[in-house]
């Protein structure tokens, strides 16, 4: 087990793939704690001892490391008299599994539920200076027994492993579902009444990536049309801090109609501190700045080609189109991924693998520029249906300039 602790030209390409892999890591993972305790039965806690048992929702806030931007959620079980203090965590995976990276990219990573000591769970968050908020749940003895039975069932070898899904089945949604199932009444969220319902998955991702423009760009490069769909209030709860906020005002409507708050008390289990880790060294230019800079270079070289050297700069087309085509192979792979909202991604018309054929030094076709223009037109049209990553339209203008120049020359 491990803790998800999540341009010379060749160098820049390597940096790009590094950025997109980090984006995958941070986008499709939440932080996790390792070193699970030996399998134990929560049923060992007697009914008489349940009075001293406290069940809490733990929300671990983001810290400065990129992989933590979405936070983490777990359930704490504290026996104040028996001394047992553990955390139930659905964020554990085994990176030593065969072909782990292959399965990870395709969204076929299996996560598992594990129980760790609270001290061990908090250690990493203390190191990074991350705040951990505890919401003690307002549960009856019967509800405590029920949630322990549910957790006991999940801890069985045949049940503890699950297929992780960032939006719909992650460490936060699992904790929420267990808690809601254990309550004898219906859990209602008054906070939902104030929500307009016009927030998309991409909006949430952007909010969590604030201050990290290249992470935001990497996520937007990978995310397709599905991420621009409006979320329901419950779907927003895939983010730990969203669930924490909803739980703050949530209430349980019992069978007799009486209402009680879901959360009995909220406290800071681990205060935010000074991180002992080095801050992430970001690239000095934003994605938009890089796209504008590239556009200026393309315009300058195209003008130089026409008015100064009067010779074709063929290497510019090969470099520009073929690099984008190579990067587009990643989007092709994502078409077969189980990760949510990545299969239909209209940015593939910009990062188009067909560029590798159309703009190969060994390929000659008189209709090449017309075909390229058609592909690029589909990309621009896609703005209606999908929110593109920062700088993508500017990058497309660089291609359009080269296509129109070549098209004009071929018609002369």
Q: Predicted segment positions?
A:
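Short, charged, amphipathic alpha-helices and their helix-cap/turn boundaries
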Residues: 142-151
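Activation targets extended, charge/polar-rich intrinsically disordered C-terminal tails
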Residues: 153-367, 377-412
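Short, positively charged and aromatic/hydrophobic N-terminal segments
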Residues: 6-9, 20
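Boundary at the C-terminal end of the N-terminal hydrophobic targeting segment
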Residues: 32-36
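Bacterial N-terminal signal peptides
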Residues: 18-29
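Glycine-rich catalytic cores of cysteine/serine-nucleophile enzymes that process amide/ester linkages
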Residues: 51-130
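Second-shell loop/turn segments in exported
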Residues: 63-64, 130-138, 157-166
